[in-house]
Amino acid sequence: MADDIHKKRWGKASVGALIVMIILSSVGSAYANKKEELVPAVSVPAKDQMVSIDINKVNDGHLHRFAYRTKKGTQVRFIVVLKGGSAYGVGLDCCEICGPTGYIEREGQIVCKLCDVVMNKQTIGLPGGCNPIPVKYGVGNGQIRIEQKELDAAAKYFR
């Protein structure tokens, strides 16, 4: 009789452990296969050979994605993020290592969508590694200004 009770307990414990393993593997699988989508880029036109972005639209410290369409029809995506104070990080939405897969913002951090590397915001706008390819820009009259020729030259990364 004691032996039967002991076997029932082991049986129930085994079934319980199996249920817990199934639940954990299902949750883990769902988390691992979760696809994070890029926020759509805001289309920006060139005017007088310059692409301008209102600083008030990008001064919240979050990642902002923009797209400029070249005369040949290539969409050149670039990102802008406030690094702190009045310093901005401006770069292409691609890198030399992973290509034009883009970046996402996850829990306040900028992350490469392909290799999942977390970027230090202070290095955005600097070359190297998986950092966004830098874009030359200027700030004036409440605008971030990028020369059209700079974005036209960057089209080679998005073909």
Language-model segments: residues:
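Hydrophobic membrane-insertion alpha-helices, especially the h-region
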Residues: K12-G28
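Short, Lys/Arg-rich cytosolic juxtamembrane segment immediately N-terminal
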Residues: D3-A13
